Amino acid sequence: MENGSRSKLLEDPYVKRVWDLIMGESLFKKSPEDLASLRESLRRECLQYFARHSPYYVDLFERLEIDPAKATLHDIAKLAIPSDMLRGDGQKRFLIQDLEEGGETFSSSGTTGKDPVRVYRSPVDLAIMLKANTDLFEHVYGDVLKQGEGVALFMAAPELRYKLSFVAFVDLTLDKKGIELLYGMDLEDKAQAGTPWQKLTTNKENLLKFLKSKKEPKLFFTAPAGVHILGQKFESMGFGKKFAYKLASGAPPIRLGKGGIIVTGGGSKGFADLPPYPQLVSNAQKHFVSKSVEGKQIETPFMDVLGMTETLTALIDRYGVMDKVPHPLAEAFLLDPLTFEPIEEEGMEGILGIFNPFTTSWLEVFYPGDIMTWHSSKGFYGKEFVYKRRLSVKEGWDLQRACGGTLEEMMTKQ
């Protein structure tokens, strides 16, 4: 955050405006109409910003006959790229000329046999990523993560902090909040047919520490496979083993305490043989116990984060309360799979497109290959998004899975 606040890019009026909006008063208090108007102005200022900082975009806008000062959502749809174009060094062509060093590069797993998607985040982008995602998370969570209170378990390995953006966001946010983060997995390097690959194995010490902790709230971050596998483990225990485990750890059930929650990453996709997400939630609620912040016993709440390497901010939902919503300044839209024109009709399936006007290093507008629908909402965004499925290889689509899917593959690979 400190490096971002010292960025020379803040001398640009657009970056300064975006920074002030992200770091300022809550955007979630604005009406959907005010936010839509704000996104429209940012859309146009954003394209003008990139035209000032890279001749690549000047040429691109001319070729596509886009006037940045009058840019519409249809123009943004024309600018959207498939995530495949970011594999290897693909992002380099899209980066601004006066790119600032000192940031971090995130990548996909590379387990598909192709070059992984790699995306560089400058110091100012990292600061915006941290603040924007934290604000969105707390809004959907329904409360502020209080400084130094609680403990979190992430069913991932610490090495993935510097690889997967979902892990990085959680790590950075909890570090900023002074909340203890335990990693529940270790990374094991193996070789298969001469190709290195990685497998996640359980860190029993950290898992036990989380289970025995008296801190509240307990935040459990995992791919959907993680919570499913843990539930199956409890169900398969005999009486004697379950009794011994309960003496050692206090579980089952796993008590998450006041404000305790399970946060999954990426929905129920990946290569695990998983039940539908509603069934996964129902099964898990037999083994996890939570209380409201007031101390009342409730069904353990679930949140799901749809994030991928390519996006600075995620879409997040809270099961049974709200479907997926983006950050107030992010533009989430659906594209017709045949025409790639924006879909305006409610309830129609389309390819998710994401435009983040607050990303300063490259014009972050892309489609990762997820089919979704949208419906009207009384919330801050005016609409919510429902995940349906990935586009398949048979449909001509062979792109990157979200971070949660990557974690699932690592957790279930034999």
Spans of features found by a protein language model:
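Conserved adenylate-forming
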Residues: 109-165
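Hydrophobic (often cysteine-bearing) scaffold residues that line and stabilize catalytic clefts
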Residues: 35, 39, 53
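Phosphate-/polyanion-interacting regions in eukaryotic proteins
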Residues: 157-159, 169-172, 176
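Short, surface-exposed acidic
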Residues: 67-74, 146-147, 291-302
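Active-site diphosphate/adenylate-binding microenvironment
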Residues: 49-107, 115-122, 135-139, 143
